[in-house]
Structures are given as structure tokens and as C-alpha cells.
Amino acid sequence: MVNIKIELNKFWNLHETRDSKLYLKGYFYSHTIYELNDILNSIELEYLNEFINSLRGNFAFIFKNSKYTIAVVDRIRSSELNFFQYKSDFYISPNISSILNLEFFKKSIDQDALLQTAMSGYTIGDDTLYDNCKSLSAGQYVMIVDDKLEVFDYFKYFDAISKQPYDELKTELTKVTLDLFKKIIKKIGDRQIVIPLSAGNDSRLVASIFHHLGVKNVLCYSYGQKTNFESKISKIIAKKLGYKWVFIPVSYSTERSFYNSNKY
């Protein structure tokens, strides 16, 4: 039996049909909720990996019908999903406390995971600090069919090395980057975009692409001490792109005041 422990709130929503339940957090660029439900209800399991790999967006979801149950996280694991098996029962939850608080859960520490955490600050792969509880890694899903649980990788970051001419790689990177920002712009709509603009290449790229794609409603800001070079360059970049720029002065006294305030 599969037990799904999720507190429905502004983040997690339940989309229920006559044949299935879909618990979803996040959003999709590539499919509507109705399309996702229809496909997952009718798909042959041998094509499931390929379909999940076609999903685009930031999401985590659990789908359950009479044939199977799957729990999926996106390619960056923007939301976590944990799972645990006890005899013939399975428990899935985004909140590991829901699993740890089960009366029959034995809190046996995974010594390897403990060492990983002590050395790096986090566990590696699908490990948690507990022997019996696992957590999906980026690009993974777990499938339960006929009381059998199996974890799959639908996406891997490290693929075969591609040997292409430099100009081809540059063209491909340009296309991928522009396509991504077009999706972001479509999602944002008419809302204002606020960019923390520094002197670095990352934020400069973001601002430049929005300008290249004709986005007008953009506000850039920088912060720090009045004479810091990052803010000076940030202001020049914003002016060149035609975007409004705001400076937020920060000093030791303002930081100390904030850290001592009730807001912090």
C-alpha cells in the first residue's frame, strides 16, 4: 500500500480525477495539468522515462492510479521528496519529519551519510542521515508497481563528451540561453523584472538578454558601500541598457542595526 503524506497548502495542490490523484508543487512550461494527468493515466510504463524527461519547469509531483505510483523531482531538485518502505507499505513525503515521526520508523543513523555531512555539510545522492529513508536526487523518480519499488534516472548531467567545432557550440549555447529566457519572459508576463546587477558576468548576461529580447519593464539595483567598484560598473551597465538603476547604501552600522532588530 502506498501512503502519501502531504499537507495541502499554497505550495502543494491535489488534482484528482475519477481514476487518479496528482499531488503537485510548482509549474510546467511544457504541459498543462490536464495533459499531464491524461498522459500519465494512459501511458505504457516502458515510455514513462522518456515522457518525464520531456517535462520542463520547476516541479515535484506524486501521481497515483490503480496501475502504479510515481514520485518525481525536476532536474535541479527544486523541491524534495523522501520515501520509505516498511514491510509492504510505502511512504512518500516532501517533509522528512512526516516519515521520521512514524511510530515504527527506526531512527538508525547511516554512518556513511553522517560522515558525508560532517565533511561537506550535506549528504550525497539519495542518502539521508537515516538508513531506511531515501530522498530523490535531481533528475530522478521512484516508481512503485505491485509492491515493488524502483528508482530511475530520467536525466543525467554528465553525458558523453561532445566534440563539435567552437562556432557550432557557441551557436547552440546561444539558442539554448535565448529559448530559456523566452520561456521566463512568457511566464513573467507584464510584471516588472528586478535584477541585482553587479559587475560580474552572470547578472550582466541576465540584464543584457532581457534588453536583447526587448523587455522594457526592468529595474536594476546594486548595494554596498558608496565607493564600491561593483556598484559603479553596475550603474554604467544599466545606463547603457536603458534600465532604471537604484543604489542601496549598506554600511557596518546599518547591518548591525538590522541584525539587532526584530525584523532579523
List each language-model region with its residue ranges.
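Short low-complexity, flexible loop/linker segments enriched in glycine and/or proline
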Residues: 234, 260-264
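Cysteine-centered catalytic environments shared across enzyme families
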Residues: 1-197, 201-256
